[in-house]
Amino acid sequence: MSLVTSATCVELLALRPRVYSATRPNGDFYLATQRHAESLGRPSAGAHTVLRCLADREHTHDELVAVAEEQDGDLGVEGVARLLGQLRAGGWLKITVTYQGRALHTLEPLRPPPPPSQEVCSAPVLSRFALLRRDDEGLLLESPRAWCDIRVHDPAVLSVLGSLADPEAGALPAEVAHRVIHDLCWARMAVPTPNTEDTELRLRQWSPHELWFHERSRMGTHAEFGNNYGGTFWARDRFDPLPARPEPFAGPALDLYRPDLAALRRTDPTLTTVLEDRRTIRVPDEDNPITAEQLGEFLYRCARNRGTVVDEGVEYTSRPYPSGGSTYELEVYPLVRHAAGLQPGLYHYESHEHRLRLVRAGSHPAVRRLLNSNVPFEQGPPQVLLVVSARVGRLMWKYEGMPYALVLKHVGVLYQTMYCVATAMGLAPCGLGAGDAEAFTQATGRDPLEECGVAEFALSSRPIEEPPNELARLSARTRQGPPKETP
C-alpha cells in the first residue's frame, strides 16, 4: 500500500543493505543487521520467494503479490500483505518513489519508522538539522533526527525542497510534490510551522553541528563496527601512515630540565591528595613567574614520549596519558608570555627529545592574538598558554567515523593529567573551553586539515594568597544577590 494514495507515483521495494537472514532449529526465520534482529515467524514458500526477490532487486507491490499468489494462491495475497507491513514497520524496506518511470527519491531506513501520517504537514519548512550532501552514489539528504536517509535521484525533488510551503511552485506536478513533501515530513527532514525544533529546550539546545557530531561519532543508526566505523585501517595500502614525529620547525632548540622520577615517587603528594586539592587558579604570581625548569618538569611528567615501537610500518608511542590505539596525535605548543629563563614566544614541545623549538617570536600578530583569545583572566593572559594541536592523520589513517571524537577524549585525559601534575608541583592550572584555531594556523603555518589547534591550557606560578575557588565565588555571588541598578 502506498504511503500517500496517488495514481501517478509508484513505489519500488527492496530490502535495505547489509541485512542478513537466519533460520533457527525450530523453523523461525529472522532478519538481522549487526545491531538488530526480528523474527518473521515461519514464512510460507511464497513469502520466502518474496524475501528473495526483495533481497535481489527492487519490485513493485503488484509484482510481489503475483509472486506470492503463484505459490500460495489466495493465501499468498494475504500473506504478502502481512509480510510487507511487518517489513515496513520494522524498517527493513527501502522505498523508491517513481513518477512516470523515473526515480524521484528513495527512503533508506536506519531504524524502524513511526507510523506514516495521512494528514498534510502544516506549512512545512526544512528542518534545521537536515543536510544535503554528495556521496559516492549521488545526493543524500540526512538528519540526525531522521529514521531514514533520503537518496535524491531527480533534480526536480530539489525544487520541492526550495518550495515546501507551495507544492505548485516546484518542477513536479502538485500531486507528486505532495508525495515528496509527505515523505520529507515523515522522515523529519521537514517540520511543520510552528515546530518543536524552536520551541522545545530538548531540541533548541542542540546546534545542528553538535547534534550531527554526537550522532555520527557514536554507534547507533549509522555507525556499525567495520562499516566505515571504528579501527578499520581504511587507508592501509592507499596512503602512508604519518610518522610519530611531526616535521620539525626551523627555529632554535632549547633542551629542557628532566626531573628525577625516582625521587618524585618518594616525595610527591598522594593521588588522593592531588585529586582533592585540584582546582582551577586564574590569578598568577607575577612577581615570581613560572620558571623554565618548572615548565620542563611539567612537560616531562605530562607529555614526553616514553618509547616508540613499529608494527606493520606504523609507529606507536607511549606517553604518561592514555591514547586510543597508542597513536598520540596531540602536540603541545607552549606560548610563553612571562617565564624566568625563557624568551616570550610560541614554542613547539618536541616530546621525543624533551626540548622546545621556537616557532614564532612573541611579537608576531598571530601569537599575540592566540595569547589573548577568549582568556578568562581578570589580570591578563597567563604566564604560559599551552596550545594543544592534533595531527589528525595519526588517528584518521586508522579510524573512521569516530577519530575526532577520540581527539576530544584525548584532550580530556591530557587536561586531567596536566591538572594533577600542576597541583602536585604547586602551580596554577586552568583548562580553557575555547580558543582560536585560525590564529594557531597563522602562527605555525601548519595545514589545518593535517594539524589543527584543538585545546588550550593555562599554566602560571601559584600565588601565595590564593583566590577563592569556583564554588566559593559562586556562593559569594549568590549571597550578594543581583547587582543593584544605579539610581
Description of each model-found segment:
Residues 361-411:
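A mid-sequence, solvent-exposed acidic-amphipathic segment
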Residues 205-207, 212-381, 479-487:
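N-terminal amphipathic, basic helical "cap/leader" segment at the start of enzyme domains
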Residues 453-487:
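C-terminal helix-cap and adjacent tail motif
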Residues 1-265, 276, 423, 474:
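Long, charge-rich, low-complexity alpha-helical segments
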Residues 346-348, 385, 454-458:
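Conserved hydrophobic/aromatic beta-strand scaffold that supports enzyme active sites
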Residues 298, 332, 386, 392-394, ...:
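Small-aliphatic-rich amphipathic alpha-helix that forms the alpha element of a beta-alpha
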Residues 188, 302, 306-310, 422, ...:
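A generic secondary-structure signal for well-formed alpha-helical elements
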Residues 442-449:
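Short proline/glycine-enriched turn/loop segments at secondary-structure junctions
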